């Protein structure tokens, strides 16, 4: 199967190329924290030679509780993103939740993300496709990997084939997720070779059935990420925080920022080894 290459400026994203890191924080908490976290990511990824795209949300529109922090909003969020780009020269990925957000967000960032809970909303897909921006589609927890082909087809019908696919786990009973590593290649096959990336931190979520916030299994982030990288994928999606216990969203799943360099060193070593192997067809 020929692998599709998606270009984010000068960054090439493909299943058979060196992995790209889509990393940052869950939600913009403040301008200063975003600057600090982005600077750390840039320093580490440049040292390790890993292509890098900064990730953060300007609005967490799908929080479980009406009282949970959502973010600074569209206007302030775009100002922060613009400053990050000007200061560090980074590419940026963020998510949109409404059709009206797609164009103004695409004018600032480099990749717009379709949230898992909204991935089948045709009006939103069409609005995102019209921007011409690179798209990252989060696989809904409730659909099979093969169904991602239908979502990508919607983008292609809208004139945009610059689509990346992202696995963030699948429902495993109530309030729990499991990652099907076999599904990564199924998604690629269902879409004609589109790049597949793995959101390791959101895959670690687990919930209190009656709680208003997600719990997580941060202690297992390295082992789950190592397993995903061993498949051979286009990229890793990661959230980190300098103080996960006090993060405003999804702290229990976030990598402690101080561990970023040793963590990424392991991921790069695995990716380098896996992609040095010749392609092996075991289907016949």
From Swiss-Prot:
Cellular compartment(s): Cytoplasm
EC id: 2.5.1.55
GO MF annotations in UniProt: 3-deoxy-8-phosphooctulonate synthase activity
One CC-aspect GO term: cytoplasm
Main subcellular location of this protein, as a coarse class: cytoplasm
Pfam families recorded: DAHP_synth_1
SUPFAM superfamilies (alphabetical): Aldolase
PANTHER family: PHOSPHO-2-DEHYDRO-3-DEOXYHEPTONATE ALDOLASE (PTHR21057)
UniProt protein name: 2-dehydro-3-deoxyphosphooctonate aldolase
Organism of provenance: Photorhabdus laumondii subsp. laumondii (strain DSM 15139 / CIP 105565 / TT01) (Photorhabdus luminescens subsp. laumondii)
């Amino acid at each position: 199967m020929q692998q599709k290459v998606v270009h984010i400026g000068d960054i090439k994203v493909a299943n058979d190329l060196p992995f790209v890191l889509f990393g940052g924080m869950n939600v913009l908490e403040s301008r200063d924290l975003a600057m600090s976290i982005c600077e750390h990511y840039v320093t580490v990824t440049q040292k390790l030679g890993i292509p890098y795209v900064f990730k953060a949300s300007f609005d967490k529109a799908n929080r479980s509780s009406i009282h949970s922090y959502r973010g600074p909003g569209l206007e302030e969020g775009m100002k922060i993103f613009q400053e990050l780009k000007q200061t560090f020269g980074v590419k940026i990925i963020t998510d949109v939740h409404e059709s009206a957000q797609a164009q103004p967000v695409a004018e600032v960032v480099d990749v717009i993300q379709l949230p898992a809970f909204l991935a089948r909303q045709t009006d939103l897909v069409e609005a995102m496709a019209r921007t011409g921006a690179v798209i990252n589609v989060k696989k809904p927890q409730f659909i099979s990997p093969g169904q991602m082909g239908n979502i990508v087809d919607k983008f292609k019908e809208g004139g945009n084939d610059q689509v990346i696919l992202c696995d963030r786990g699948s429902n495993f009973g109530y309030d729990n997720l499991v990652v099907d590593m076999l599904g990564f290649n199924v998604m690629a096959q269902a879409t004609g070779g589109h790049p597949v990336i793995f959101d390791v931190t959101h895959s670690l979520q687990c919930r209190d059935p009656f709680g208003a916030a997600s719990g997580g299994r941060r202690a297992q982030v390295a082992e789950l990420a190592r397993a995903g990288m061993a498949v051979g994928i286009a990229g890793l999606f990661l959230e980190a925080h300098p103080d996960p216990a006090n993060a405003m969203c999804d702290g229990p799943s976030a990598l402690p920022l101080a561990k970023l360099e040793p963590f990424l060193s392991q991921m790069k070593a695995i990716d380098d080894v896996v992609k040095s192997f010749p392609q092996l067809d075991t289907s016949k």
